[in-house]
């Protein structure tokens, strides 16, 4: 199975963490 969902989830998680920690 192509890990497309995992890739998108990882990117979204990183973006959310960036916004939450305000280190963008």
Curated annotation (Swiss-Prot):
Expressed by the skin glands. It is found in: Secreted. Keywords: Amphibian defense peptide, Antibiotic, Antimicrobial, Disulfide bond, Secreted. GO terms for cellular component: extracellular region. Disulfide bonds join 18-24. One of its GO terms (biological process) is defense response to bacterium. Antimicrobial peptide active against E.coli (MIC=8 uM), K.pneumoniae (MIC=14 uM), B.cereus (MIC=12 uM) and S.aureus (MIC=17 uM). Has very little hemolytic activity. Belongs to the frog skin active peptide (FSAP) family. Brevinin subfamily. This is Brevinin-Eu.
